[in-house]
Structures are given as structure tokens and as C-alpha cells.
Amino acid sequence: MNTQQLAKLRAFVPEMRKVRHIHFVGIGGAGMGGIAEVLANEGYQISGSDLAPNPVTRQLTKLGAQIYFNHRPENILDASVVVASSAILADNPEIVAAREARIPVIRRAEMLAELMRYRHGIAIAGTHGKTTTTAMISSIYAQAGLDPTFVNGGLVKAAGTHARLGSSRYLIAEADESDASFLHLQPMVAVITNIEADHMDTYHGDFENLKQTFINFLHNLPFYGRAVMCIDDPVVKELIPRVGRYITTYGFSEEADVRITHYQQKGAQGYFTVSRQDMADLKVVLNAPGRHNALNAAAAVAVATEEGISGSDILAALAGFQGTGRRFDFLGNFSLEHVNGKGGSAMLVDDYGHHPTEVDATIKAARAGWPDKRIVMIFQPHRYTRTRDLYDDFANVLNQVDVLLMLDVYSAGEVVIPGADSRSLCRTIRSRGKLDPILVSDPAKVTAVLAQVLDGHDLILVQGAGNIGKIARNLAETKLQPSLNEEKHNG
């Protein structure tokens, strides 16, 4: 951003008093790194710490941020404020040092709320679909020439980053309900995509508490703000009468204000009509597969329509939508001639979905777009608590694929829960008689095991939220070919 654009921005976004140096603990996370990137581009001095380098930290280093790959008290030297990821514990040395030095320690969402304070905020919340919906809305606003700032939880492929500082008053942000921190936000427009039981430890196992928290979030809107709510979701629909704000509903339902009809999928694209009250219908070509993505697009249409964005800009943005990282992310189509000698090819798709509903949506999109292909899934369960709480749902959903390779549970710091491990889940799926899962406890063996099960007309889904994305990238880089060491080790 040049000096003139920054001056224009300062006209409606004043600086944070005496704050000059902002330190992030856990800066490598997508959400944390995105906020840090926006603040770096606004001219603040940025530093941060994490355990290992990744694309987020490398991008921030290019912007001049000082990144430490350790957690030490001296890292916060001269910081005006310390921003802590929700994954950071209270006894972290940097947090302890900041409190002893009386430096304010805030959560990620509090800093996001500060970014939103003087802007026209659009916040996207819900159990599933937040990242993609945020990216779609950002793409439409950019197409319309509105140059928004956005902060997303995933890579926005068209921008090549998780976050971007725009010169306008618009801020489009993913809102995180996992720790209820989205209650810090005070947007002008809020989207609720859906609500399911997830992160229930935050809500003390009480689903009513979770629902009330979403209502409280919507009541952070000013009385003249707008809630955009998916009426297809039964829990969201149930909450509508309890929301005292202007509401626009969307979905496939006949009751929806912004309604999807005539949906068809051909390969990776969706074709459908969006009907809007008292406005011309939109014939949408969406460059993203699955009915779930049509719903995400309908939410984006509802937000854009409220802003007065033209139908032509909406359609152009959705047709050219490049997607987000690890959301049905097509990594290539690879020949198997040198993989297992069987010939043919295999498509490789990487997907972040780690809740049964998300996994089910990915499988359905794959079936609809490529009905002649076998679905070979490599799945890594994420957290023992989630596996325990949604055990039967996982077993039912995973039973839909043709071949299943199961990795060990990615613990995310949790202790092992007996009966909620991958071996138990494989045993349960096998007992149902349709599928014989293959447990691959050693990630280094995945490529070799995969080579043995491919038959030349497969769609490989690499599925999960842990470190399985590295496996997907490795498969793409090696074109699915196991190394000699893998073959020998496996043999």
C-alpha cells in the first residue's frame, strides 16, 4: 500500500494511540498471521513467536516482521501489546513476562475487533463453511472495485494470502466460535452458515449455551445491521425468531429470501439459479463443487445484494472464484504408469474438513462431479475428544468411500482417550461389512500403501485438519510415486 492509500485509510481508521510494536504469540496460525499481516501493512512494528517456520511466517518475514522460533521472555521486549492465540496457555513464558511487565495481553479476536472498530465489518460465523464464504464475499467485493480488507482462516488463492489490507472501509473477516471469542466483534453484517455441536468443551457440553452464544454474537450487530442466516440449517432456523435484528435468509428452502434452485454439478463447477426478492434472478456458474458451496455462494450473494453490488459483478466473481487452500483443493491428475504399473491415472484433492458433516459434503461433491471414479480417502481424525463425541457419525460417513486409509488421530495436544483412537474406528467400520479400512500408523508409509490400492480410475481425497496437508503436498510433489526407501521398508 502506498503513502497516499495509507493516508486515505487513516481518514477513517485512526492509529491505536501509543501502540507501535505488536507481538503475537503463536503467530504462525492462519488467523493470527492474517491479522499480523494487515497490521504490518498498516505500518505497525510486528514481532511474533511460534515453534516452526511455515508459509505464514515466511510471508510475514518478507513484510519485515521479526519471527522467533521459540517462546522466551525476551521476545516481548519493547512490545506495546501482546496478542495470544487461543492455543497458547497462561504459563507460556512470553505471556508470564508480559503480565509481569504490565503489558496488555489480549486474544486474537480482540485485535480483530480493533481492526473492525472503525470499519464496515462483515463477519462470517458458523460450524462449517466460514473460510470459503469469507473468500467468496471478499472476491465479490474486490470484483466490484470496493478494495476490501479481509482476514481469513485459510489461504485465499486469488490473493495468494490469508489476509490483505485494502484501502476502503470494508473489513471481511472469518469469526471464530471455537473459543467464543467472536463475541468481541461488532460487525455491521453477520453471516451464520450453520450450527452444530463442535468445540463443546468451550460451552461446557451444553448445546443450548452454544446456541445462545450465537444469538449474543448477532446481537452485537447495531439495530440497523443485518444478520444473514442459512434457513436450511435446522438449528439456525430455530434461532431466527430469537434474533432482534434485520434478517436475510438463504438456502434451497422455498422460505429463503435468497433461494437456490435448479442446482447441477458438472465436474468441479456448480450451475444454479439464485432468486432474490424483488430482484432479477442470477444464473450462477460457481467454480467450486458441491451443494455446500452453493450455499456458501448464496450467503455471499445475500451480503453483496445488501450492499448494492451489481449482479454482473457477483456472477463474474463466482465464475472466477479460485477457492481457498485445502478446501477441495485440486492438486493434480497423475499417471499411474510409474506408480504401480497398472496404468490409468488418479486425481488428487486435499481437503481440510474434519467434522463428519464436512467430510460427508466433500464425499458427495466428489461423487457428483466424478461419478465414474472410485473414492480413495486418506483420513486423519482430529482430536480425541471430537472422535469420541462424533464416533458413530464418523463411522457412518467414512463408510461411504470405496477405499479408506486411516492415519492415527492428530491429538492437537490432547491425551489419548481409550476407544476414540483410529484403530477402534477402523474396527467399527470394518464390523459393518462394507469397507475394510487400512490403518497406516506410520505417515512415511502412506505413499507406498496408496500405490498398492490404486487401480487407474481413482479420486484420492486427503482429508483432515492436522498435519495431513503435508502428506497431500508430498504426494503431489512426488506424483504419487513411493521412494525406494518406502518400497523397501514396506516390503
Curated annotation (Swiss-Prot):
Domain of life, per lineage: Bacteria
Subcellular location: Cytoplasm
Gene3D superfamilies in the record: Mur ligase, C-terminal domain, Mur-like, catalytic domain, NAD(P)-binding Rossmann-like Domain
Catalytic reaction(s) noted: UDP-N-acetyl-alpha-D-muramate + L-alanine + ATP = UDP-N-acetyl-alpha-D-muramoyl-L-alanine + ADP + phosphate + H(+)
UniProt-recorded Gene Ontology molecular function terms: ATP binding; UDP-N-acetylmuramate-L-alanine ligase activity
GO CC terms in record: cytoplasm
Keywords: ATP-binding, Cell cycle, Cell division, Cell shape, Cell wall biogenesis/degradation, Cytoplasm, Ligase, Nucleotide-binding, Peptidoglycan synthesis
Keyword Cytoplasm in record: yes
UniProt: ATP binding residues: 126-132
Function field: Cell wall formation.
Listed PANTHER family: UDP-N-ACETYLMURAMATE--L-ALANINE LIGASE, UDP-N-ACETYLMURAMATE--L-ALANINE LIGASE-RELATED
NCBIfam families: murC
Name the UniProt record assigns to this protein: UDP-N-acetylmuramate--L-alanine ligase
